[in-house]
């Protein structure tokens, strides 16, 4: 894994989380490919518009911390894998999440854009 590629993908992902922290829905949307598929831990899948509207209506992110991240590059595609711990308000109630995730990023017009994300809840131990 190239340190440069990992840094680029982590920076793009940092911008995504910062947009959610700032409730900057335009910035959040801009970091996604128009073909985004976001498959939730519940198996429900959102497209880009559905996901942004869902986050805007239901969630207020308070913190997010990635762990154990790996990034593999395949030309203009990068696959990111790791874990993330998040604190948020979901439908007005505090919620903690610890997920393992897989994310697919595509480089388009010189920018890395998220095109697929799938979190899986990590069981409590």
Give short role names for the model-derived ranges.
Residues 1-30, 35-125:
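A beta-strand edge to alpha-helix "cap/lid" segment located at domain peripheries
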């Amino acid at each position: 894994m190239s340190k440069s590629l990992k840094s680029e993908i982590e920076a793009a992902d940092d911008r995504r989380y910062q947009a959610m922290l700032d409730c900057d829905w335009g910035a959040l949307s801009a970091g996604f490919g128009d073909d985004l598929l976001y498959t939730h831990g519940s198996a429900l899948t959102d497209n880009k518009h559905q996901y942004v509207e869902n986050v805007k209506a239901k969630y207020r992110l308070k913190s997010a911390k990635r762990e154990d991240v790996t990034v593999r590059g395949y030309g203009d595609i990068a696959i990111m894998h790791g874990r993330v711990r998040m604190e948020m308000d979901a439908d007005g109630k505090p919620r903690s999440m610890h997920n393992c995730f897989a994310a697919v990023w595509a480089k388009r017009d010189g920018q890395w854009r998220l095109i697929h994300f799938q979190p899986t809840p990590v069981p409590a131990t």
